[in-house]
Amino acid sequence: MKITSGDLPGVGKKISFITSEGSMVVLVIHHTGKREMYFFDDADDDEVSFSLTLSAEETKQMGAQLLGAILNPADTDKIDRIKLIRKQVVVEWIDITKHSPIISKSIAQIEKMKPKGISIVGVFKNDEMMVDPEPTLVLEKGDTLMAVGKRDAIQKFEELCACKENN
């Protein structure tokens, strides 16, 4: 499956999935939490075959099913614990811009710079998602980091990665 991702200014993010059979699903994630899914029979089609709008909660439920999770009423304690964790832990996609101070730095170098309470779990580079990136991987303009951590640590890390054009 080929996956591409990009920003939609003022809207949110767009992620396109092209299957091995050549069909395509486009997911638009709005800043409001709303998700829109557009299904194309062929990746080259301009006309949508089918579309679907989901709330953030509906998306979570669908995602759990796609991951093969089976929810039983007896699992409510686990679900409550997961909800508590989700309030404390954030998954963030951080775009590396041309003025970012972490361009040309390896994952190992960034690991030493990042605040405590955050993990870099993936890098989206050249239209490929690299899960658990190698320490020697060097970041370039246009790469996107996937980071997981506590909200305050994520915010500090975003500030570290942000462009500092005025310096």
Swiss-Prot record:
It is found in: Cell membrane. It comes from the Bacteria. Transmembrane segments: none annotated. GO terms for biological process: potassium ion transport. GO terms for molecular function: monoatomic cation transmembrane transporter activity. Its main location: membrane. Interacts with AmhT. This is Ammonium/H(+) antiporter subunit AmhM.
